[in-house]
Amino acid sequence: MMSETNLESLEDFIDTQVLEAWRGPKKVPVEEFFTSGHRTCQGCESAQLMKLMAKAGGPRTIILGSTGCMYVANTTYYSTPWAIPWMHTQLGSSGSAATGTAAALRVMMRKGKMAKEPINVIAVCGDGGGADMGLSAISAALQHTQYNLLILMYDNESYANTDIQVSGSSPWGANSTFSPPGKVRRIMNRRWKKNTAAMLAAGHPDCKYVATVNTAYPVDVMNKVRKALSIGGPTFIHSLDPCPKGWDYDPMFAHELGELAVETGIWPLYEVENGKFKMYGKSQRILSGQFKRKPVREYLGRQGRFAHFTEEDTNYFQSKIDAMWEEWLIPGVIPFTNA
């Protein structure tokens, strides 16, 4: 077993870098590290997320991609879009792969086989590989505080790569391959969406940074990625990504749906940094009363997966969102109420 002294002697090899926030799009460099050559669907916001993430990390970044949409669509033979090192890992092992890669880099630097320099380790996974099958590996990774890494979950609210099966992130009532509305039972998926980011933030007090993002707000995405890579230790970011195939919408509305998810209060934008909670953008304005939440029907009505909703279903969905902001201990985030 390694002694505390030896553990402390390795601290020099946990290099972090200072990635300053970009103040507006004009400050963002033009160089791209996720380029043409991918095979994502038109209107896929997860592809936009990969582009923003890679740009935020820069050239000294290693990407680990678990099985999912962003693996299959980005690894067509001889046409990868990645201009930085990338490795495939199994569906539920993004956390394990990130920890192992960060540990290997540390050993190589300690043995003098690599120059001591900050190298970003980012593991990406979908909601199936993150909120479901890979949750235990992510939890374990967030407890290894000696390693610098970021786990980024792109959440399109289904197993979209294998034809839109229900995941733990699928919203209540949504039509999917495994939850089609029927004549006897109209609502087949009766579970509310898993609150992954808040769950990981609350359950891992040593994790310095957990955040939510949405590609409709690209500068916010990049700055949160840069903060996660700079703070030191394992971090987690949860992105809500509209999916034209699974959500059944015209690709031209992808960006607008991302905005509506925030403006209706369905998807709060926040971060937990060193245990301190902070809302961002319109979510902060909703919390302070400066912005009135839009009705959820504006969001639901743009998507074919909710086309079977009756007025009763829409009102129920609205009541759940109202409760998130009006009754929860931390509005929109922590689903506890005072006794």
Q: Which stretches of residues belong to each language-model region?
A:
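Flexible, low-complexity linker and terminal segments
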Residues: 1-6, 13, 241-339
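Cofactor-binding active-site loop characterized by glycine-rich and histidine/acidic residues
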Residues: 4-154, 158-160, 164-174, 189-190, ...
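Arginine residue identity/basic-tract feature
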Residues: 23, 39, 60, 106, ...
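Short secondary-structure junctions and interdomain/linker hinges
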Residues: 48, 60, 64, 207-208, ...
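Glycine-rich ThDP/TPP pyrophosphate-binding loop and its adjacent helix/strand module
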Residues: 117-118, 132-150, 154-292
